[in-house]
Amino acid sequence: MPLEQDSLLPEQLYALKSLQTRKGIVEITEKTKIDIEITELGAKIVNSKISSEEMIEQITPEILKKESSWKGKRFRRYNMTSGVPAIYGGKRHFVNQAVDYGRKIWTEMGFKEMTGDMVDSSFWVFDALFTAQDHPVREMQDTFYINKKTSLPDKKIVKAVKESHEKGVDGSKGWAYNWDEEDAKRLLLRPHTTCVSARTLASLKKEDLPAKFFALGKCFRNETVDWSHGFEFNQTEGIVIDPNANFRHLLGYLKQFFKKMGFDKIRFSPAYFAYTSPSVEIHVWHSEKKVWLELGGAGILRPEVTIPLLGKHIPVLAWGPGFDRVLMDYYQIKDLRELYKNDIAQLRKIKFWMK
């Protein structure tokens, strides 16, 4: 008579262990015992009056072809509220959806798009923008450098930038140091898209003016990563080159853009940047964190930037706020790191960018 192992006495277990070492004496088999008990809902269904009438649940082409298959029979009602399996169709990454929308806004506002490489020279990233070669932002703790150098652009532009740094232009004194051409050749991952604006300004001719340009692309900084900072981010860039442009126009462009992006609360505060004067910081209200979120800077480019690149000083409105922070409020994201964490569930369920 088979015995259950759990019911054996200690001495029986000892005997079993000894006999298991001998072949053909003990046979152990494993069986699964399942106890089933009807639930309260099941009991209600059993006691209810369920019709045994045959009903058609699906209407198929085969059923419709034969009148005898459906005539005189009943069709089961469709329950429009019953749960169905979720279907996740293919779609663009939600950050890319927002980036495309940002491009659409600038285009509708009459701007032309600028593009540029993510790897650029220190000349275009810093020197052309009147950032001194001993400025802290150029140190390795802020910028990702590449262990290679590149050639410099047209000698005329290089000479003009060098003089701007060493002696100044239009009455300024510059930075009063010896500008190093070799330092300007260093390659780096661009920390901002303003280098694209610098290249664009240098390529313009008199007949191209007035003009409005924008860029929206990836930037990289050696930042301490937290909920509002990342080492990789999108930035939206803009320049307006117009002899009649003024500071009020600058604020107007920015207000219009961020309102179209869905922000009602926008404010500006005075700021300092090496290549603009006057300068402002742009802030929008983050409804989830209940704080004013700083997006970046804007201002009118200094003569030390415009004269070397354009040949003369013309008012150039310029801005370069971070774009990823703009998305946080719409997607109810509390941490910038959530934008790129490769969470499949998030990518499937997050809403489309619709404004």
For each predicted feature, which ranges?
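Short amphipathic alpha-helical interaction segments
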Residues: Q5-R22, E27-I28
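TRNA-recognition modules of translation machinery and tRNA-sensing kinases, especially anticodon-binding
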Residues: T32-K355
